[in-house]
Amino acid sequence: MTIRSPEPEVKKVKVVVDRDTVKTSFEKWAKPGHFSRTLAKGPDTTTWIWNLHADAHDFDSHTNNLEDISRKIFSAHFGQLAIIFIWLSGMYYHGARFSNYEAWLADPTHIKPSAQIVWPIVGQEILNGDVGGGFRGIQITSGFFQIWRASGITSELQLYCTAIGALIFAALMLFAGWFHYHKAAPKLAWFQEVESMLNHHLAGLLGLGSLSWAGHQIHVSLPINQLLDAGVDPKEIPLPHEFIFNRDLLAQLYPSFAKGVTPFLTLNWSEYSDFLTFRGGLNPVTGGLWLTDTAHHHLAIAVLFLIAGHMYKTNWRIGHNLKDLLEAHKGPFTGEGHKGLYEILTTSWHAQLAVNLAMLGSLTIVVAHHMYSMPPYPYLATDYGTQLSLFTHHMWIGGFIIVGAAAHAAIFMVRDYDPTTQYNNLLDRVLRHRDAIVSHLNWVCIFLGFHSFGLYIHNDTMSALGRPQDMFSDTAIQLQPIFAQWIQNTHASAPGSTAPGATASTSLTWGGGDLVTVGSKVALLPIPLGTADFLVHHIHAFTIHVTVLILLKGVLFARSSRLIPDKANLGFRFPCDGPGRGGTCQVSAWDHVFLGLFWMYNAISVVIFHFSWKMQSDVWGNISDQGVVTHITGGNFAQSSITINGWLRDFLWAQASQVIQSYGSSLSAYGLLFLGAHFVWAFSLMFLFSGRGYWQELIESIVWAHNKLKVAPAIQPRALSIVQGRAVGVAHYLLGGIVTTWAFFLARIIAIG
């Protein structure tokens, strides 16, 4: 008798929905706090409005039904997309209605981008600066003009049409959000169908998304940009649909188009190398990446993701099963390995979100570093204001997203983690040796902090004593970043050895002596690294490690600690462990996110200061007819940034002159923002450095005075809770700091760049 193991059941993936789940009604809109029994009663004290805002989107607190929570999140995503489409539509509409896009397109080296004109009310029209070509408006640094040119947009009419299209898509998204919550709401099983979701997201979003963009680039962007680069008047260039429907037009520019798909079907793919290139480096006309390289890149990415989108098992017997994959991962030292993680990621959206935010935040920072080193759009590299803005923007956003990852990881630990189902797997093992992790990380932070700061203090002291020969610098005691220089050199010498088809390295910043200039401005050149970079790099290492220490400690000790063993019962955010237990304040997971934000701010500030000064000193500048490059700050980074005094004197103070002296000019708004944002930042300290009782006492006196005059309010005033005060404090601290930096950077770079 043969015993057969039962055939593994092939699950059937179906789209399952519930019809007419929630009645559509506007009545709830008139009942603030309808989602909570306590809030729905209405306000007794002013705390009500704070709790209303804190809990409005905390779907976990509205219900513990995972299916309903999933549907709310899904529906909210469509609302988010609608907002994005409305915002994009506004950007394109401004380009169509209020901008000098067509003038910029005709002469991008002499005309600056502007898409906002201030109305003449009480003299505000002073903000309309002369951006060239007789146009007066606010100079913008968002990079939209450059991306429009790369897309092949040649007229303001096309921008109008796109703006209208975006509004139509916004309406569609709003409809979809309503439809999939009220009319046809997916069942929980659909949200947990990970293999199908992976296939569709990989093949659909990333695969077909990249393929359609590659198609647009090949059929529309490439020919239009080729003609623009050759100096053809934008009004003479055929419209996009003419290129799409008339192959002969394309064949004039790219001869392989005349052959159609024959080379593709006969595997002679190299025939297409006239529009799918592998050149490396930058286009000397525009200072951007070769658009034929980027089209090739998107086509390759599309192929990879289309394959990736067919790797996971759904209704057929072929492909990976994610649960099996995770549970098969057992190393010799990792116990049960990934066992149990599948259940976590399919039942806790906080855990899922934490992983995704950590990835997305890191990717955003990677984008920041590639935008300047491999500028993807025409004339982006020589628009210094835009380069600085894009780098700063992506660094800030990446920092915030990474802190968000820690926040949601901690919420997962508090609300969704079930210790009974997680035994000896990786998560359990990390939690069991959390003391070793945190204490070692703490040691690393102390080491990095003392040593990195100590190098600067040494230099300041030697400088003050008049002993330059004893300083750490490129001209005295050298601390060269030899590993970074080795990586630069490896990449600079790659073309011809490891990448035989490439004519230049991936980025000019690696080295090799080439420099690209556009209209007598430097687009990019090899970036030298020396002692100054070595020093500031270790400050980066220090601030990043401290941020990680705070955030990771918050996650690892979110449920319990030696100080508060029952922390999980107190929730994600709480001020202290009740009265009578001193020294237990500021230990909640929320407080760790709060503290982590300040160190994230420290970390990103040092990065953007480093970038701003380094680029002005060693990269950005003008080139004379004789080929001599003059940098904006004349290469002073290497000698000035090696002391704290140098950073204060030659960077912050020297470069603040433009924003401080901006009054009476078209940059005066930045001067006012600089002043106002300092005030907002200082205002935050009032919330961060004072206790709740102080304000409650003050409020009691004020209420007494109102009672005397018989004008006492029906809703009782209350001081902010400890957590609310800290939230308001950190929000103003970050807003004030970021706007101060924004005004400082832009006034400087627009005035001189």
Curated annotation (Swiss-Prot):
PROSITE patterns per UniProt: PHOTOSYSTEM_I_PSAAB
Keyword Transport found: yes
Binding locations of [4Fe-4S] cluster: 576, 585
Pfam families recorded: PsaA_PsaB
GO biological process assignments: photosynthesis
Location of this chain's protein in the cell: Plastid, Chloroplast thylakoid membrane
Enzyme class: oxidoreductase
GO cellular component term, pick one: photosystem I
SUPFAM superfamilies xrefs: Photosystem I subunits PsaA/PsaB
Molecular function as annotated in GO: 4 iron, 4 sulfur cluster binding; chlorophyll binding; electron transfer activity; magnesium ion binding; oxidoreductase activity
Topology class, membrane: Multi-pass membrane protein
Cofactor binding note from Swiss-Prot or TrEMBL: P700 is a chlorophyll a/chlorophyll a' dimer, A0 is one or more chlorophyll a, A1 is one or both phylloquinones and FX is a shared 4Fe-4S iron-sulfur center.
Residues annotated to bind phylloquinone: 695
Binding residues for chlorophyll a': 678
Domain of life according to the entry: Eukaryota
Transmembrane domains' residue ranges: 73-96, 159-182, 198-222, 294-312, 349-372, 388-414, 436-458, 534-552, 592-613, 667-689, 727-747
Record-listed E.C. numbers: 1.97.1.12
Family the entry assigns: Belongs to the PsaA/PsaB family.
Protein name, UniProt field: Photosystem I P700 chlorophyll a apoprotein A1
